A protein has these predicted regions:
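Bacterial N-terminal signal peptides that target proteins for export
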Residues: 1-8
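N-terminal signal peptide c-region/cleavage motif recognized by signal peptidases
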Residues: 16-21
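C-terminal cap of thioredoxin/glutaredoxin-like
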Residues: 22, 26-52, 59-74, 192-256
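A short, surface-exposed interaction/processing loop segment used at functional sites
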Residues: 70-97
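Long, charged amphipathic helices and adjacent flexible linkers at domain junctions
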Residues: 96-105
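A short beta-strand-turn-helix
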Residues: 104-122
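Structural alpha/beta surface segment adjacent to cysteine/selenocysteine redox centers
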Residues: 120-130, 136-200, 216-221, 241-243, ...
């Protein structure tokens, strides 16, 4: 191979690296924002000469725009002359939609008990403690949707309310038919006797701890902690007290 050919191959091999280096050079204000903890999630162009950036901090999205000399950044929403928020769809695309997909996948991988048909169009995750009266009330309110095949509840057990919550949760999880056991327990308002293991097996303890960590990561500190996807695919949260009728219709994707 001639010297010129070797040089040409070397230059060609470096081109992707050089391109990546050039693309990674951010305007100074964006770099300063990154040092403050903001993370760049995406960029967009509204006009040929008007570019915006989407950044995220602690789960919250915002848009950033640069001055013409690129020495200053303006952080906040962009509103047009009619009051329309032009930032919202871009924040949704680059921050909240990916975040919803990620959290939904984590919910799917958690240890849950299915209550409802496989082909139910609406899936609703519910973190519950066996001693939570509001969880029981929500379970009863959800029956019309579940029984009609419109909703599948995915009930995620946690142990936070009483010292033996873990024993009751483990009894439900370890039973031959967790769905029936939970159904009998909730429908009897906790009067059904549970075969509580003592001690709780290590794998069940690990599952309960993982469920609690996920619940905390989602920002929940009360049960029931209810999660579902809006028609737009955004993760929605409902905590604590059982929802009113209108909110129930929203969670369940419609009327029963």
């Amino acid at each position: 191979m001639h010297h010129n050919e070797r040089f040409l191959l070397l230059v060609l091999s470096l081109l992707p690296t050089l391109a990546m280096a050039e693309n990674n050079l951010l305007p100074v204000p964006l770099t300063a924002l990154e040092k403050q903890g903001l993370e760049l999630k995406g960029e967009f162009t509204l006009k040929p000469d008007f570019k915006g950036y989407v950044m995220e901090y602690d789960g919250q999205g915002t848009t950033v725009f640069l001055s013409p000399d690129k020495k200053h950044a303006f952080v906040g929403n962009l509103v047009d002359s009619e009051g329309n928020n032009l930032s919202t769809p871009w924040i949704e695309k680059y921050v909240y939609a990916p975040m919803a997909r990620e959290m939904w996948q984590k919910l799917e991988k958690s240890r849950w008990i299915q209550d409802g048909k496989d082909n139910a169009p609406q899936k609703v995750y519910v973190f519950f403690d066996p001693y939570c009266p509001y969880c029981t009330e929500f379970w009863h309110k959800a029956r019309p949707w579940v029984d009609a095949g419109k909703v599948q509840l995915r009930l995620i057990p946690v142990a936070i309310l009483r010292p033996d919550s873990n024993l009751k949760a483990a009894a439900i999880m370890m039973s031959k038919d967790p769905v029936k056991t939970l159904h009998d327990y909730e429908s009897s308002h906790w009067k059904t006797r549970l075969d509580k293991p003592d001690p709780v097996p290590a794998d069940i303890t690990a599952a309960l701890q993982a469920n609690l960590l996920l619940m905390e990561k989602l920002g929940s500190n009360a049960t029931p902690a209810i999660y579902y996807l809006s028609p737009e695919g955004r993760l929605q949260q409902q905590l604590g007290l059982p929802p009113d009728d209108d909110t129930m219709n929203t969670i369940m994707g419609g009327k029963p």
